[in-house]
């Protein structure tokens, strides 16, 4: 009989003995590196744009056991834009909820007040407006589709989402979540990082800087210079290139100001590059 894979199998460093857990709390969240690099959570655009560009992640197919076993080579992510201000916080809440209650099941229930706290929303703001915002974010996250196909021309496909079920029962004030076990491998040790949230908390409403932080946090030590073209792609901004570059420079400066980043910006030919000297998730780079 096939053994069901649950969240506890991938939130621990040792899946055999369930030892050395990766801590999920108000200052840390576990995030798949792929999610942080692909631009699933991006800043709100300056003008209306409900849908993000299709994200082709076919190059990751060799890392998915599910994709290899089923012969899927064409993998795409589509759906509404997920912002940093609310949607990313709700996603953090989802990860934390599963880290607490998904030990033996991929389907969990918890009180709305607890879920909102896990998302990082103050308890004193649990009003009708916040409930509506969280419910809308759950809908958007559930609607983010991941499609697996056996080649671009194949008519056979497997469609799933970032989460299988996201249900908020306003009558009982309960949130119900269910995950697709086929995607748990995204959280395996080689492909996940502990994202510390000090910078997110220090950048309220500064979505470009927040999104840039999550991308830079996913990079390995001593990364190569990063072109602004790559940063524009990751942030999925929709303004003119010149304006995008200005916005990116402002966000980089903000990360430097809060003590998260020591970096230089240089121009080579027609392109700008970010050169990272040091990163400090605890915002202590200026004191080091």
UniProtKB/Swiss-Prot annotation:
The Swiss-Prot or TrEMBL record annotates one GO molecular function as: DNA-directed DNA polymerase activity
- Keyword RNA-binding in the entry? The reply is no
Keywords, A to Z, come to: DNA replication, Plasmid, Plasmid copy control
What biological process terms from GO does the record include? Answer: DNA replication initiation; plasmid maintenance
Q: Which InterPro entries match?
A: Initiator_Rep_WH1 (IPR000525)
Protein origin, superkingdom? Bacteria
Signal sequence span is: none
Main function: This protein is essential for plasmid replication; it is involved in copy control functions.
Q: So what family is this one in?
A: Belongs to the initiator RepB protein family.
Q: What is this protein called?
A: Protein RepA
Taxonomic lineage from the root = Bacteria, Pseudomonadati, Pseudomonadota, Gammaproteobacteria, Enterobacterales
